[in-house]
């Protein structure tokens, strides 16, 4: 079993709204994955009763499909849904990192960003990296439609 922590994020930063993103220290989702014949999702924690566990309706289902990595996935929600802190992005980002490791796909963190962004399309209708990029890469990121940059800077 692989366990990862995926931090909350903010991508609502002034003139960089939905472009600039920053990872936060707290809260965070904890995602545990183990290989399985078919994908199942179990969710506990903040607002879990409002989140679908059907892989076709959950952000992590798209990540599983993109990585061809069926698994039993446990998500302990620390990032409350509809809080404006990238709840769905944290789950998708954490699943991408954990499944990449579990299945030894060898993808870099940067290569996982567009995969996790596909998970965002499940809940928002559009694949976007504004929240998944900082959740995966940490720190401050700039995400446009065709590019993501990680900015190495101290965040106060």
Could you describe each region identified by the protein language model?
Residues 1-83:
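ATP-binding N-lobe of GHMP and related small-molecule kinases
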Residues 7-12, 16-23, 82-92, 122-139:
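FAD-binding core of FAD-dependent oxidoreductases
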Residues 10, 53-61, 89, 93, ...:
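Electropositive phosphate-/nucleotide-binding environments in soluble metabolic enzymes
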Residues 28-30, 61-65, 93-100, 113, ...:
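Predominant activation on well-ordered alpha-helical scaffold segments within soluble catalytic domains
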Residues 36-38, 69-72, 99-115, 149:
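Phosphate-handling active-site elements
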Residues 85-109, 114, 136-138:
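DPxDG-like acidic metal-binding loop motif
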Residues 109-156:
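ATP-dependent small-molecule kinase catalytic core of the GHMP/sugar-kinase superfamily
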């Amino acid at each position: 079993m692989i366990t990862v922590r995926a931090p909350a994020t903010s991508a609502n930063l002034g003139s960089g709204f939905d472009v600039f993103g920053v990872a936060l220290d707290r809260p965070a989702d904890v995602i545990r994955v183990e290989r399985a014949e078919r994908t199942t999702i179990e969710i506990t924690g903040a607002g879990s009763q409002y989140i679908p566990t059907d892989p076709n309706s959950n952000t992590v289902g798209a990540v599983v499909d993109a990585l061809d990595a069926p698994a039993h996935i446990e998500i302990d929600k620390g990032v409350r849904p509809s809080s404006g802190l990238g709840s769905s992005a944290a789950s998708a980002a954490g699943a991408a990192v954990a499944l990449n490791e579990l299945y030894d796909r060898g993808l870099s963190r940067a290569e996982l960003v567009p995969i996790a962004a596909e998970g965002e399309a499940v809940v928002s209708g559009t694949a976007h990296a504004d929240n998944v990029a900082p959740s995966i890469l940490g720190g401050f990121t700039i995400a446009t439609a065709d590019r993501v940059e990680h900015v190495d800077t101290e965040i106060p």
